[in-house]
Amino acid sequence: GTNSLSGNELDYYGGFTGAVPLLEDYLSYDGGILYYDYPGMTDQNTADGARNVDFVEYYGSLSLNVPTPVTDIGISYYYGFSPSGFQQDNYDYQNVGIEFAVPNTPFTLSGAAGFTGSEMVDGNSYTDYIATISTSAFGLDWALSYTTVSGYLADQDIDQITWSVGASF
């Protein structure tokens, strides 16, 4: 089968975030709903013909801040679930990450590993990894990241180095 690609992805989301009472300095949470919209895109790989590939994801995460004598270390766990999605019936995504400031520098190092398990066509799943160094300067957020994937489609050249500049307001 083939896909009709629109070339666009629009994401809509809503949720809540907060800190666990009495542990505000150490433990926080986040939860919500994401809607992935692919205007004009349909999946031609289904037995009954084309269907819309837009999907909803429900997510929750916990973050732990561990103070040490040198620097604080942040550890996070994320879980997302979608009852339907791009060429699949169900999928879940789990991610564990760590982040810490490099002592006596303006830099932060972070890394994460995520696992996608799904009932996709051919039952494929994969693990993704990311390592990032970031800083803030001149009113902007700067980051250099390396991303790789193992498992599904791992034989393709999907290692990436990404340089990003952003602003928050």
Residue locations for each model-derived region?
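Hydrophobic, well-structured mid-protein blocks that either form specific transmembrane helices
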Residues: 28-92
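Glycine- and aromatic-enriched membrane insertion/assembly motifs of diderm outer-membrane
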Residues: 1-31, 35, 167-169
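Outer-membrane beta-barrel "beta-signal"
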Residues: 131, 135-137, 156-169
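Membrane-embedded beta-strand positions in outer-membrane beta-barrel channels/transporters
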Residues: 11-13, 57-61, 95-97, 130-132, ...
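Sequence/structural signature of outer-membrane beta-barrel proteins
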Residues: 1-5, 21, 34-45, 67, ...
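Membrane-embedded beta-strand positions of outer-membrane beta-barrel proteins
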Residues: 14, 29-33, 60, 73-77, ...
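Short loop/turn motifs that connect adjacent beta-strands in outer-membrane beta-barrel proteins
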Residues: 19-28, 65-73, 101-109, 136-139
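Transmembrane beta-barrel outer-membrane domains
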Residues: 3-9, 49-57, 87-93, 122-126, ...
